[in-house]
Amino acid sequence: MRDIMGMMGKVKEMQAKMEKMQAEIAALEIDGTSGGGLVTVRLDGKGHMKSLKVDPSLFKEDDVEILEDLIVAAHKDAKDKAEAVQAEKTRELTAGLPIPPGMKLPF
């Protein structure tokens, strides 16, 4: 019985830590860039775009396709960085727990 109570306490502790981690991640702002800094996309920790900055030199009619590609690339860069931060925070939180490889948290 004592083991079950101890385990329940650990579960509640883990839940509180997970909620704190999720709040920290949601508050993050991550920049992704492309074109050597000509395009910058800022995402929040949930992956929502907060801002987009484009160097005025890209506003030429024949450069529209390039601009579109750079925006997509900057967004991907920011999203990849956000996912890496989330994965690292999750690894730190779950260190030592027997969680199967590839299982994404929170469930």
UniProtKB/Swiss-Prot annotation:
It comes from the Bacteria. One of its GO terms (cellular component) is cytosol. One of its GO terms (molecular function) is DNA binding. It is found in: Cytoplasm, Nucleoid. It holds the Pfam family YbaB_DNA_bd. InterPro entries: YbaB-like_sf, YbaB/EbfC. Keywords: Cytoplasm, DNA-binding. Binds to DNA and alters its conformation. May be involved in regulation of gene expression, nucleoid organization and DNA protection. Belongs to the YbaB/EbfC family. This is Nucleoid-associated protein R00231. It comes from Rhizobium meliloti (strain 1021).
